Amino acid sequence: QKNANFESIKTVEHKYNLIDNEEDAQRLYDYLFTKQILSLDTETTSTHAVDAELVGLSFAVEEKEAFYVAIPSNREEALKFVNIFKPLYENPEIMKVGQNIKYDYEVLMNYGVEIQGKMFDTMIAHYLIQPELYHNMDYLAEVYLHYQTVHIEDLIGPKGKNQKSMRDLAPSEVYEYAAEDADITLRLKNVLEPKLKELNLEELFWNVEMPLVPVLAHMEMNGVCIDTNSLKETSVNLTNRLTEIERHIYELAGESFNIASPRQVGEILFGKMKIVDKPKKTKTGQYVTSEEVLQQLRSKSPIIDEILNYRGLKKLLSTYVDSLPKLINPRTGRIHASFNQAITSTGRLSSSDPNLQNIPVRDDDGKEIRRCFIPEPGCLFFSADYSQIELRIMAHLSEDPNMTEAFREGNDIHAATAAKIWHEDISQVTDAQRKKAKTANFGIIYGITTFGLAQRMNIENKEAKQIIEDYFHTFPGVKAYMEKSKEIVRKKGYAETLFHRRRYLPDINSHNGTVRGFAERNAINAPIQGSEADIIKVAMVRIFKRFKAEDIKSKMIIQVHDELNFSVYPEEKEKVEQIVVEEMQNAYQLNVPLVADAGWGNNWLEAH
C-alpha cells in the first residue's frame, strides 16, 4: 500500500551515483577503502546464489549517499570490476553491513571473493529483536524509517514466467533502486544496533548468529551429493508398496474408491462401514478424516492403519522421492538446500528446497530417504548428534537433583527415570517401562496433558495421571522449573534462552484456555529448544573455524536440529571426529555433561 505519510525516493533528497567504467570504479574503491563501515548489496540474475550472475554492486557509507557499479555480462569483463573491489570486501578491518548478507556472501564466492571482517545483517538483527514478525527490507523500512522503498516488482514485473531479469534493464533504470537498497540497509543498521544493546542481545548477535553466516554460506554453496540410483530404487519400492496397500484397502472396504479424497474416505469409513456411531462432520456436512481423527480410531478397524500408511507413503513420495531429483543442480550435480536463519520462532534453523529437517526418521520408509544422501566421491559420511540435549538442558535449568545425578553418572536417562517412577533397581527395568519413561520424559517437559500422554502411550487416563504424578514426585525440580517458567513469562512477556534469545508470548495472559495453554507450553519449551539451537550454532561456528585453522578439507554439509553431518576424506577421519565431538561437547558448560554420539558410513542412513 502506498502511504502518503511515508517518505520515499521521490520525497527525500539523496545522492545516488551510477558508475559504469573501470576508472570511476577505481576512484570509488579508493574512497570506500578509507571508511570503517561499508553497507553493501548485489544485484543479480537469480534468487538462487549458486546460479546467480552479478548485474551490479551497491555501496553506501553515509546515509542518503550511495553508489551503484554496473557489472558487464561477460564474465571476464565482470571479474575486472569485481577484482577492483575484492580488497575492500576482504579487508578484515572494515565492517560489512547487509540485508540477508549470506546471499551477497555466496554470490561473491562465485567470483572468487570471500567477505572478511565483522558483518552486520539487518535481517538477523531484527529476527533477534522481534522473532515473530517480518524481516524483509521493505517492511523494516516502513516500520523503522517510515520510508517506502522502490519494490523490485516495479522494475521487473510481478513473479511469474514473464518476470524480467535485472540483466534486461539498462543500468540507468536500475541504479536508483539498487543504490537505495544499500542506503536503507545502512540506515536500518543505525536504528537496530542500539536496540540489540538495549535488549541484551549483543552477545548472541556478534558471537553466535553473525559468525554462523559464513558457515551456512559454505554449506549451501557446497551442496550435498545425491545417489540417484538409490532414489530410483526407493521410488519403485514405495510405488509397489502403495499399490499393495491400495489393493488391501479396497478389499477391506469391499469396493474401490479414491483414497486421496478425504470426502470419499469419509463416506467409506463412516457412511458405509459405520466405524463409529457419531462421526465428526465439517460445517458443510462432510465427514472429518484428518490424521488426528483417524489416529484416535485406529483400534476400530485395520483399514484405518492402512489409510494412514497410504497417506504417509504418498507424502514421502511426493515430498522427497519424486522431488529430490528435480532439485539437483545441473551444473554442480548436487542439491543446494537453503538454511534459513531468520524463520523459526525458537531460534532453530530451518531448511528449504529440500526441507531436510522434516525427513521422517521414526519409520523405516522415511529412513530410506536418508540412504540417498551421500558424501563427495571418495569420502565418508560422518554424523554427530547430541545425546538427549533437551533433557540435559532441562536438568541444567531446573537443577533437579535426581535428573542431574542420572546424567552425571552417565546412566541411561530413560531407564533411570523408569527405575525412579516404578521404584525398581535400574537393572530390573523392562523395555516396556523404559519406553513409557521415554514418552513421559519428552512429553512432560513440553507440558503434555494427561489425555495426551494416555493417547501417546495407549493407556487409560487414570494410569497416565498416575505416571505424571509419579514423574513430578521423582523430579520435583522439573515441576518447579515449569511453574517458574510460566511465572517469568507472565511477568516479562517473553521467555529467554541461555544466550538471552527472546520469544515473546503475549497469549500467556489470554482469557481463552486453549490459547493460554499453548503459550504456557511454549514458556517451558522455548528456553529448552532455543538453548539447544544456540548451543549447536556455537558448535558449528567453532568446528568451521577449527577446520580452517587446521587445514581440514572435509566439509560440514547438513544440520538438522541436534545433529551435524559431514563429508569426510578418509585420511582426515580421526581428526574430524576428534574436532567435531570436542567442539560439540564443549560448546557450553551445562551443570551436566553435554554428550555427542558419532557414526560413520557410506550414506546418511548408515552414519546416523
Question: Can you say where each PLM-predicted feature lies in the sequence?
Answer:
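Conserved beta-strand -> loop -> alpha-helix junction used to position metal-binding or nucleic-acid-contacting
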Residues: 114-130, 144, 410-414
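C-terminal structured "cap/appendage" subdomains that terminate the fold
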Residues: 543-597
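Hydrophobic, well-ordered secondary-structure elements that form the walls
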Residues: 97, 261, 347, 385, ...
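Conserved catalytic core of nucleic-acid polymerases
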Residues: 164-167, 214, 221, 329-332, ...
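Conserved catalytic alpha/beta cores of large enzymes that bind or transform nucleotide phosphates
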Residues: 91-99, 108, 370-394, 405-438
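Short, basic/hydrophobic alpha-helical segments
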Residues: 77-93
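Conserved "right-hand" nucleotidyltransferase catalytic core of DNA-directed polymerases
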Residues: 1-73, 90, 99-101, 132, ...
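A short alpha->loop->secondary-structure connector
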Residues: 109-119, 133-138, 400-404
